[in-house]
Structures are given as structure tokens and as C-alpha cells.
């Protein structure tokens, strides 16, 4: 490691410890030439993930951009910031687990919508209306009907969490 003071290429590590989140190693170093002490940080370099946009342009995956879209769709809804960041974490983990260097923005949008559908229906519809660019009211209504059908299927399946006995009719 080159000394920032005298530019000598030799240094020794005096102290090494992980940071609070454990993702970065902080190292105190001392120059072998002039004795100047300095700090370096070592972290795993994430492979850049490129998003292929609808127009074919490519840009680096941006967590903040995904989060902004979710925040906009959940505006004035009972969805916590923690939940929204959790969605972004889940989407990013899912995308990175595919092992690809490039992914289409459509796939990312679908992953976000899968998550939002289970969290808040209004946020889901808002996100879908921007993401899918509904051309007219009929396309919008079709999306609502699909959502209502999914709800019916969910309601028809008995929940494993149900522990109480069904209510009996009074005679």
C-alpha cells in the first residue's frame, strides 16, 4: 500500500478490525519508510449489475431509484420505511442471486409488484399503473380484476395460523 505522505510502496498493518456492520475491514497502517500512520478500508467489491431499460439503454442498478418508486406508490399509506427498504433488499437479493450481470427493468418491476401485492394493495396498484403504463381504463380494470381473483384464491385457502374453532350457530 502506497504511503499518502511519502509515496513509498511499503507499509505494515498495525491494527485491523471489522466495522460495526461487519462488511468492511478497517486497517491502521504504518509506512515502513517514514513511519506515517494512515487508515485504509477493505470491502468486497460487488459485481456491477446493469439494468436494461425499456429503450435498450443500460445503467447500473440503483437501490435508491427503486426505493423512490416504492415510496411514491406508498405515499400516505400505512407502509413503514422499514418495510419499503425490506422490499428493496429482497428485490436486490433476488436479482443478484440470479447470477447475471444484466437484468431487464421489467423483471425488477415484476419483483417489486410481487412484494407490494402482499403488503398493500393500493401501493401495488399505484406502482403497477406507472410501471405497466396502463393505456386506458379497461387495462386498469383488468389489473384490478386480476388482483381481486388473487384475493379470492388467498381467502379460499385455509390459513395455517387459524387456531380457533369455527363459530357455531345459536339454536
Swiss-Prot record:
Pfam entry (one): ATP-cone
Zinc finger (unnamed): 3-34
GO biological process: negative regulation of DNA-templated transcription
Cofactor(s), by name: Zn(2+)
Alphabetically ordered keywords of this record: ATP-binding, DNA-binding, Metal-binding, Nucleotide-binding, Repressor, Transcription, Transcription regulation, Zinc, Zinc-finger
Free-text remark on how the cofactor is bound: Binds 1 zinc ion.
InterPro entries: ATP-cone_dom, NrdR-like_N, RNR_NrdR-like
PROSITE patterns in the record: ATP_CONE
Start-end of Basic residues biased regions: 1-10
Superkingdom of the organism of origin: Bacteria
GO molecular function: ATP binding; DNA binding; zinc ion binding
ATP-cone domain span: 49-139
Segments of this protein annotated with the region Disordered: 1-21, 152-171
Protein family according to the UniProt entry: Belongs to the NrdR family.
Chain's role: Negatively regulates transcription of bacterial ribonucleotide reductase nrd genes and operons by binding to NrdR-boxes.
Protein name as it appears in the record: Transcriptional repressor NrdR
Amino acid at each position: 500500500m502506497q504511503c499518502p505522505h511519502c509515496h513509498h510502496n511499503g507499509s505494515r498493518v498495525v491494527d485491523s478490525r471489522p466495522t460495526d456492520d461487519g462488511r468492511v475491514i478497517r486497517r491502521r497502517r504504518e509506512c515502513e519508510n517514514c513511519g506515517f500512520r494512515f487508515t485504509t478500508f477493505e470491502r468486497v467489491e460487488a459485481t456491477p449489475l446493469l439494468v436494461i431499460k425499456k429503450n435498450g439503454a443500460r445503467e447500473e442498478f440503483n437501490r435508491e431509484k427503486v426505493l423512490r418508486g416504492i415510496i411514491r406508490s406508498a405515499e400516505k399509506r400505512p407502509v413503514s420505511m422499514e418495510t419499503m427498504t425490506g422490499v428493496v433488499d429482497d428485490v436486490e437479493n433476488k436479482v443478484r442471486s440470479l447470477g447475471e450481470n444484466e437484468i431487464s427493468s421489467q423483471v425488477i418491476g415484476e419483483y417489486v409488484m410481487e412484494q407490494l401485492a402482499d403488503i398493500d394493495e393500493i401501493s401495488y396498484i399505484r406502482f403497477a399503473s406507472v410501471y405497466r403504463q396502463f393505456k386506458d381504463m379497461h387495462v386498469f380494470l383488468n389489473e384490478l380484476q386480476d388482483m381481486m381473483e388473487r384475493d379470492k384464491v388467498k381467502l379460499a385457502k385455509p390459513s395455517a395460523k387459524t387456531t380457533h374453532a369455527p363459530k357455531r350457530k345459536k339454536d
